[in-house]
Design a protein with these regions (language model features):
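Conserved ABC ATPase "signature" region
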Residues: 5-23
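Conserved ABC ATPase signature
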Residues: 27-31, 35
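Conserved catalytic motifs of ABC-family nucleotide-binding domains
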Residues: 48
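Catalytic Walker B motif of ABC-type/P-loop ATPase nucleotide-binding domains
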Residues: 52-56
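H-loop/switch region of ABC-family ATPase nucleotide-binding domains
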Residues: 88-89
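H-loop (His-switch) and adjacent beta-strand-loop-beta switch element
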Residues: 101-114
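ABC ATPase nucleotide-binding domains
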Residues: 119, 127-152
Length: 152
C-alpha cells in the first residue's frame, strides 16, 4: 500500500477546515466570490503561518457571504491560534467581527477594542457622533481571556 505524502494530508485537512473539498477540481473562474475567497484563504494556510494579512477579504461578497467568511476566520483564529491583520473600509463589519481596531487616517488616530475606539475623540471627529453611536460592536461569544501581543 502506497503511503500518502504529508503534503497531500495537509492539503486535505485545510480543504476540510475551509470547506473547499468540493471545489478542488473546479476551475477558479467558475467559483462564486465566497468560494474564491475560501480557496484563497486555504492557499494562505498551507505554510502554517502565524499571521494572516487580509486586504478587504469580504469585498464583493453579499452580506450572508460576509458573515460566513468572518465566521470561518473566527474558527481558524481559534483552532490555529494565529493572528489576523485585516484591512477593511467596512466599519460595521470591522466593529462587529474584530477584537482590536486600529483606525488610520494619515496616521494612527486611535486603537483598541471596538467599544473603546468608537468613543475615542479622534474617531468621533472623523465619523461624527451618529456614526460612533450606531456602530455594531463585537460581542465575544465565549467566556475566556485572550493573550494579547502588542509589538511596537
Amino acid at each position: 500500500m502506497a503511503r500518502v505524502p504529508e503534503r497531500v494530508i495537509a492539503i486535505e485537512k485545510i480543504a476540510d477546515e475551509t470547506n473547499i473539498k468540493s471545489l478542488l477540481e473546479k476551475p477558479v473562474h467558475v467559483l462564486s466570490g465566497g468560494e474564491r475567497q475560501r480557496v484563497l484563504l486555504a492557499r494562505s494556510l498551507i505554510g502554517n503561518p502565524e499571521l494572516l494579512v487580509l486586504d478587504e477579504p469580504a469585498q464583493n461578497l453579499d452580506i450572508s457571504g460576509q458573515l460566513a467568511f468572518y465566521k470561518l476566520l473566527e474558527q481558524i483564529y481559534q483552532s490555529r491560534s494565529l493572528s489576523i491583520l485585516m484591512v477593511s473600509h467596512d466599519l460595521h463589519m470591522v466593529m462587529a467581527t474584530t477584537k482590536k481596531v486600529v483606525c488610520l487616517f494619515h496616521h494612527i488616530c486611535c486603537s483598541g477594542e471596538p467599544q473603546i475606539v468608537t468613543k475615542d475623540p479622534e474617531f468621533v471627529s472623523l465619523f461624527g457622533n451618529d456614526m460612533a453611536e450606531m456602530m455594531a460592536v463585537y460581542q465575544h461569544g465565549h467566556n475566556h481571556t485572550h493573550e494579547v501581543h502588542d509589538h511596537d
